[in-house]
Amino acid sequence: MAVPKRRMSRANTHSRRSQWKADNVALQHVKVQGQDVQIPRRLVKAAQLGLIDLD
């Protein structure tokens, strides 16, 4: 029979979850409509096609 895992205290849960951090997205230098912009790599094609607004 399966045995449930032990309950983890809130302090232990928060300290365990706080070990990872999100990385900053690498920005690409792209010239769009005569303007030099820095955008994430995944948006380069959309920006060149004019599908997204660059303010």
From Swiss-Prot:
Q: Name one GO molecular function term.
A: structural constituent of ribosome
- Domain of life per record: Bacteria
Family designation: Belongs to the bacterial ribosomal protein bL32 family.
Q: Which residue ranges have biased composition labelled Basic residues?
A: 1-19
Which residue stretches belong to region Disordered? Answer: 1-20
Task: Quote the protein name from its UniProt record.
Answer: Large ribosomal subunit protein bL32
Question: Which keywords label this protein?
Answer: Ribonucleoprotein, Ribosomal protein
**SUPFAM superfamilies listed in its UniProt record:** Zn-binding ribosomal proteins
User: Which InterPro entries does its entry note?
Assistant: Ribosomal_bL32, Ribosomal_zn-bd
